[in-house]
Amino acid sequence: MFIDNKKKGKVGQVLKQHLEPNSKLSIISSYFTIYGFKELSQELKKIDSINLLLTDANITQDISILYGEIEDTKYKNLLDQKKIAKECYEWLSQKAKIRQLDSKTNFTFSTYNIENKDNNNLAIQGNSNFSTTGLGVTATNSLFMNTAVTDFESTKDLLNNFNEIWNNKTIVKD
């Protein structure tokens, strides 16, 4: 399935449809925003765990992206940033393992892998970061091209690829 966050489906909606209680989620994304979390928080609170690999080498020096993108003005105007940040922090503390890609390694796309007990798995690969624009919630002029697969063999292959990167200590750090 092709997902463009406009006419051909939205990454956030596809994730919501596949996230189940006790799902295991594995994500590679340049960054992660609290407003992206807010949009999926109902589903994310029910999952078992998340492995989150951030690929933007500058994220440790400049964490401002955590508080949203330029398109997130409507969220910032609600003045509930502190509440959302606290909720996100608590959720990450309970459910997440977070690692970062080494700054010398270039990774130019994002992946989302959902493992469910009933093998109703999903994998999405493309250029949608974990943000409101990347999830297709907030309108943007950016172009997104993502592919979602649900067949067992493809989801297994993409998850295996994620795990190879996740466990590679030469390019990934805690």
Model-derived segments and spans:
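PLD/PLD-like phosphodiesterase catalytic module centered on the HKD motif
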Residues: 1-174
